[in-house]
Amino acid sequence: MAEQTIAQALMLGVLEGFTEFIPVSSTGHILLAGHFLGFQSTGKAFEILIQLGAILAVLSVYAGRLWKMLIELPHEPATRRFVLGILIAFLPAAIIGVVAYQIIKTVLFETPLLICTMLILGGIVLLWVDRWAKKPLYRDITQFPLSVYLKIGLFQCLSMIPGTSRSGSTIVGALLLGVDKRAAAEFSFFLAMPTMAGAFAYDLYKNYHLLTAADLQIIGVGFIAAFVAAVLVVRSLLDFVSRRGYALFGWWRIFIGVLGLIGVLVLG
């Protein structure tokens, strides 16, 4: 395995971990990095399996709370209602993701210009919502009305357009619906668990034939890097957005989108 390839795997794993749970589009960053670095040979298999590192990261950080919810589920109505809310929010993306899988993966994911455009547009929207979102009505993620869970789930469907961001679409939707900034990020974590796990399982089912023993080393490096980076982000993001909001992420999206556009137009 070439040293340069290991270095690329490490970089892309860190990139996946750091960007998966913040509203900047991990897919957009990974695809643009792969496009400009020429990291195409293990593309799909690598991208699928490093996502597992990010999934396990959020599960490990919230393991105690998830275990408590599991114990309470049979006899605690509030816990059952919260789990129902997560399921309601998850279903729209699950249904559309399966129905439109081929279009999403073969058409939209092959368009760097679209990715850059969505990074920029999403950055502008995030800046606007961060500045002008209405006064928070909901601060406890377990107490949203069921209609709010559904609407956040519908917003999440926008993330199927590469460059939009899964966490970004859910956070923007939550803020527009009156959810507190911290709670918006926290609910995005919980919604990520079934959404990312489902996407990972379906992607793996569709592409398992691409996995080879030769890829294991590079995938292992990317997986570990993604896990460590994602743990750091999940542990720190809630306090960060409570103090600073989301403006920094909006400006970052615009910067990367413009940089990507220049690269696409100049380098192709």
Swiss-Prot record:
Q: Which family does it belong to?
A: Belongs to the UppP family.
Summarizing the function annotation, the protein's role is: Catalyzes the dephosphorylation of undecaprenyl diphosphate (UPP). Confers resistance to bacitracin.
Membrane-traversing stretches: 5-25, 43-63, 84-104, 107-127, 184-204, 214-234, 247-267
GO molecular-function terms, A-Z: undecaprenyl-diphosphatase activity
Which InterPro entries would you find in this protein's record? UppP
Recorded catalytic reaction(s): these are: di-trans,octa-cis-undecaprenyl diphosphate + H2O = di-trans,octa-cis-undecaprenyl phosphate + phosphate + H(+)
A Pfam match: BacA
Please tell me what else the database record remarks about this protein.
Bacitracin is thought to be involved in the inhibition of peptidoglycan synthesis by sequestering undecaprenyl diphosphate, thereby reducing the pool of lipid carrier available.
**Top-level division of the source organism's lineage:** Bacteria
Q: Which E.C. number(s) belong to this protein?
A: 3.6.1.27
User: What are the recorded Gene Ontology BP terms?
Assistant: cell wall organization; peptidoglycan biosynthetic process; regulation of cell shape; response to antibiotic
Is Cell membrane set as a keyword in this record? yes
Query: Which named protein is this?
Result: Undecaprenyl-diphosphatase
